[in-house]
């Protein structure tokens, strides 16, 4: 015979709900994105440690490259060394500010603050899926 919801005690229902949640990883480590190492060559800006930055934030370099193109309004490309080359001269302050904004919007989970997220593109929107709490947040694509 199956039990109805009102046959359960509150504690039993609460325990059942908790058992359905994904495992929560508690990490005390601090999340620090490396500061961009910027160098100017003629009228171009090179981000020397671009590959290292994308590895730390766990994002495809092409996505961060597209973000820079949209925000700065200039062409950009990656060389074989994993450096990003932007047309135009941009200070390290501007570059680091954009990286911080990208991380805040497209990496950090707005629900639990975890950095363990995946960015999934569906049509014209991104979905930020948190691997720690399971939350999904819809974001505007760029």
From Swiss-Prot:
GO molecular function: translation initiation factor activity
Keywords from the named record: Initiation factor, Protein biosynthesis
Pfam families xref list: eIF-5_eIF-2B
InterPro entries: IF2/IF5, TIF2_bsu_arc, Transl_init_fac_IF2/IF5_dom, Transl_init_fac_IF2/IF5_N, Transl_init_fac_IF2/IF5_Zn-bd
SUPFAM superfamilies registered for this protein in UniProt: Translation initiation factor 2 beta, aIF2beta, N-terminal domain, Zinc-binding domain of translation initiation factor 2 beta
Gene3D superfamilies, per database record: 3.30.30.170
Domain of life assignment: Archaea
Record keyword Iron present: no
Subunit note: Heterotrimer composed of an alpha, a beta and a gamma chain.
Protein family according to the UniProt entry: Belongs to the eIF-2-beta/eIF-5 family.
Function: eIF-2 functions in the early steps of protein synthesis by forming a ternary complex with GTP and initiator tRNA.
Protein name: Translation initiation factor 2 subunit beta
Protein encoded by which gene: eif2b
């Amino acid at each position: 015979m199956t039990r109805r919801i009102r046959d359960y005690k509150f504690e039993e229902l609460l325990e059942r709900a908790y058992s359905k949640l994904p495992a929560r990883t508690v990490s005390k480590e601090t999340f620090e994105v490396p500061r961009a190492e910027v160098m100017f060559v003629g009228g171009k800006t090179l981000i020397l440690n671009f590959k290292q930055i994308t590895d730390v934030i766990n994002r495809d370099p092409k996505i961060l490259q597209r973000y820079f193109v949209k925000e700065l309004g200039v062409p950009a490309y990656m060389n074989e060394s994993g450096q990003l080359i932007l047309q135009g001269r941009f200070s390290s302050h501007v570059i680091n500010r954009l990286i911080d904004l990208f991380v805040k919007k497209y990496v950090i989970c707005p629900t639990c603050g975890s950095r363990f997220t995946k960015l999934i593109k569906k049509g014209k929107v991104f979905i930020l899926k948190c691997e720690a709490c399971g939350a999904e947040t819809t974001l505007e694509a760029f």
